From Swiss-Prot:
NCBIfam families: PRK00124.1 (NF001095). HAMAP family: UPF0178 (MF_00489). InterPro entries: UPF0178 (IPR003791). Disulfide bonds: none annotated. This is UPF0178 protein BCE33L2782. The lineage of its organism: Bacteria, Bacillati, Bacillota, Bacilli, Bacillales. Belongs to the UPF0178 family.
């Protein structure tokens, strides 16, 4: 298993790096050049930089990921593609994307886009909380322990 992180706006990178390093599982952070950092990463953690274009990180992750790899993303489109490839996919708020829930998530995203296109406003996501982070940590640890 390898871990790929859609890292541009991922609030749980620290959890992923800490837990994966302890378990000696390689992590690849995929992020745009606009988030460039020369900060040192622990052994087993690689950062791949991609252009800032829409979905560039998603395409790179899909190019690299193999069946049964673990992907962390908040992007439903990437999650859908990764599930079809046989990957395990987690959201940073601590839930696992499945073939059973992805269609509903994509449908909700589409309907919200149509509402916004018509000029109306939709609710944004709820703020990320410490409880969300701990929920993610528990799920992540249970997945990498398998």
């Amino acid at each position: 298993m390898k871990i790929y992180v859609d890292a541009d706006a991922c609030p749980v990178k620290d959890v992923i790096i800490f837990e994966a390093t302890k378990a000696e599982i390689p992590v690849t952070l995929v992020t745009s050049f606009s988030h460039y950092s020369n900060a040192e990463q622990p052994k087993g953690v690689e950062t791949i930089y991609v252009d800032s274009g829409a979905d560039a990180a998603d395409y790179r992750i899909m190019q690299l990921a193999k069946k049964e790899d673990l992907i962390v993303t908040q992007d439903y489109g990437l999650a859908s593609l990764a599930l079809a490839k046989g990957c395990i996919v987690l959201h940073h708020k601590g839930y696992k994307y499945t073939n059973e829930n992805i269609d509903q998530l994509l449908q909700t995203r589409y309907l919200s886009a149509m509402v916004r296109k018509s000029g109306k406003r939709t609710k944004g996501p709820k703020p990320f909380t410490a409880e969300d982070k701990e929920k993610f940590r528990a799920l992540f640890k249970s997945i990498i322990a398998l």
